[in-house]
Amino acid sequence: MRPLGALSLFALLATTVSGLAIREPDAKDWYQHATFYQIYPRSFLDSNGDGIGDLAGITSKMKYLADIGIDATWLSPPFKSPLKDFGYDVSDFYAIQPEYGNLTDFDKLVEEAHKNGIKLMLDFIPNHSSDQHEWFVKSVARDPEYSEFYVWKPPATGGGPPNNWISVFGGPAWTYNAARGEYYLHQFTPQQPDLNYRNPKLLAEMTKMLFFWLDRGVDGFRLDAINHMFEDEQFRDEPVSGWGQPGEYDSLDHIYTKDIPDVYNVVYNWRDQMDKYSAEKGRTIILMTEAYSSIEGTMLYYESADRKRQGAHMPFNFQLIYDFKKEQNAVGLKSSIDWWMNNMPARHTPSWVAGSHDHSRVASRVGLDRVDQVMTLMHTLPGTSITYYGEEVAMQDFKEAQQFDNRDPNRTPMQWDSSTSAGFSTNTNTWLRVHPDYARYNVDVMQKNPQSTFHHFQHLTKLRGHRTMQSGEYVHKTVGTKVYALLRELRGEDSFLTVLNMAGAEDTVDLGDFVNLPQKMRVEVAQPNSKSKAGNEVDISKLTLGPYDSVVLRATVSSAAAINLSIGLLLAIMARYIFV
């Protein structure tokens, strides 16, 4: 026997087993495993009967959000606006749109949110303001303080716009202002002039505004259309892309109006200031970015290429919106998830967006028979889930509601119950028409039905509170082209296996090649129409899944099992010392 004695070996064994049993996973901050919920204020709840949602209505539903497992909510812009783009054209960043309430109402909302354990985020639009903003009016008049707050250029030689730039909504990105005698840039509508971030005073004013809302208790910001903030300083023509028709946004390759490096520096500086504020106040303030960009450009919002500067806590990840379609299979789904996870810098948090005010609703994109599947996936993937209001009751687009914008169909009033205007308002005339199927798809009806999308959503958000879901690793694979499986595991904790049948036919699959899983597992969550039932035991070597089915299976890991594993390992080590 080697010099190490038996007593020493047993002491080592005891110490190691003890260490393995009590080791804690890395601590996670609140946002790293949160369930976010986007509220479109105009459509959530009308408290005064004018047919328009408001802050008081949102405030009254904070307990509801807490009950369904929401950790944080972000509001589409509640700021004062002429509503040419329904709040994304801000005329006063320091005031609330009168239809929604006032600052007192906002303060009550923040208080009620925090009382219910919910963080409150604001949608912040840094790229532009309304053309009715005081700054723009003064800039037109060449007020020395505000003259360069916007991007102005003289007409091109011979007249006309300064260059060939096209707005996101089509047509020239330049509009001539006769009073000033120059063109102003607007990457969106002519009523949304671009702010000039090359002007230090403008940048200082916008930063000051962020702290105004932080001091009112806001927990962070979603930075809308962030990659449009800067333009090429030489204002060069953009090359033709070969896509789209002349005059359409896609007809140009936007190398001079998007993803300019200066954008990232502003985000990194704002992150530095948010972190400093967080340290002073003892609460984590976060930044989220929305940018339709390349994967390389998007990942730079997390951190700089040299990893010395931190940016957004989470860029928005829209891949599930784009890739989880009716025709998607398991291989394509896995590739979509890998696309984000394999490009994300180490130690950062992924986000998974199911829907938003700019996109068709889940039920309309994938069909009512697959809504529960999407909910299962996004709530069991690692990181943050981001849900759009009404997805918990499978709300659908309503094309006939379109009145102001082609995105109106997915912005219709929240469906609370079967009463007048779906319980959204006592007024029969609401700002957008209510979806006609509201009597079937609403909170009240689904709350009373334990086999509903609502309860499925609630079960999943509750499961997200488990330590494995918050801090565990993930492994995922496909079984053929039809079945996708995702394993979440954390040493010393129960493991969870999410399984999705992406096909419209029943299938029986063998998932036994996942290591460290027992052959028999318990069904933790099953979608309402599943072949499986919560609480039942199943054999993962022959798991039967219904069409478009999804289940979450649980493998219980006892402390005794963990100790036995450690003892087995160390006994093998002892044997090596004894018999070699």
Curated annotation (Swiss-Prot):
One GO biological process term is: carbohydrate metabolic process
Keywords, in A-Z order: Glycoprotein, Glycosidase, Hydrolase, Membrane, Signal, Transmembrane, Transmembrane helix
* Transmembrane feature ranges: 560-580
What's a single GO MF annotation on this record? Answer: alpha-1,4-glucosidase activity
Q: In which tissues is it expressed?
A: In 4th-instar larvae produced in the brush border membranes of the gastric caeca and the posterior stomach cells (at protein level).
Question: What residue stretch is flagged as signal peptide?
Answer: 1-19
Q: Does the keyword Calcium apply?
A: no
Q: Where located?
A: Membrane
CDD domains the record matches: AmyAc_maltase
Active-site feature positions:
D224, E290
**The keyword Transport appears for this protein:** no
Name the predominant localization.
Answer: membrane
Highest taxon of source: Eukaryota
Quote the annotated effect of K115M: In strain: GEO
GO (cellular component) term, any one: membrane
Reaction(s) catalysed by this chain's protein: Hydrolysis of terminal, non-reducing (1->4)-linked alpha-D-glucose residues with release of alpha-D-glucose
Q: What class of enzyme is it?
A: hydrolase
Q: What is the effect of changing A95D?
A: In strain: GEO
Marked site positions, Transition state stabilizer: D358
Q: Could you tell me the membrane topology recorded for this protein?
A: Single-pass type I membrane protein
The job of this chain, per UniProt, is described as: Probably an alpha-glucosidase, it has no alpha-amylase function. (Microbial infection) Serves as the larval receptor for Lysinibacillus sphaericus BinB toxin.
Task: Relate the assembly described in the record.
Answer: (Microbial infection) Binds to L.sphaericus BinB subunit of the binary toxin BinAB.
The entry sums up its family as follows: Belongs to the glycosyl hydrolase 13 family.
Name of the protein in question: Alpha-glucosidase
Q: Which organism does this sequence originate in?
A: Culex pipiens (House mosquito)
